[in-house]
């Protein structure tokens, strides 16, 4: 009995996911793995640059 419920929940979850994709809410999923990796690396580089600037500002103040 539990498996039937589990299947139904999985079906509903999958249906919701496909509806979101068709509505265009999940645009990030349309990226390939390499594109996503490139985008994420750029974001992390920007964050690291900001963190380094904050760190250097704190050391110059002391």
Curated annotation (Swiss-Prot):
GO CC terms of this entry: cytosol; nucleus; protein-containing complex
Compositional bias annotation for Basic and acidic residues: 1-30, 50-62
Localization of this protein: Cytoplasm, Cytosol; Nucleus
Region (Disordered): 1-62
Membrane-crossing segments per the record: none
Role according to the record: Positive regulator of amyloid protein aggregation and proteotoxicity. Induces conformational changes in amyloid proteins, such as APP, HTT, and SNCA, driving them into compact formations preceding the formation of aggregates.
UniProt similarity note: Belongs to the SERF family.
Protein name per UniProt: Small EDRK-rich factor 1
Organism encoding this protein: Mus musculus (Mouse)
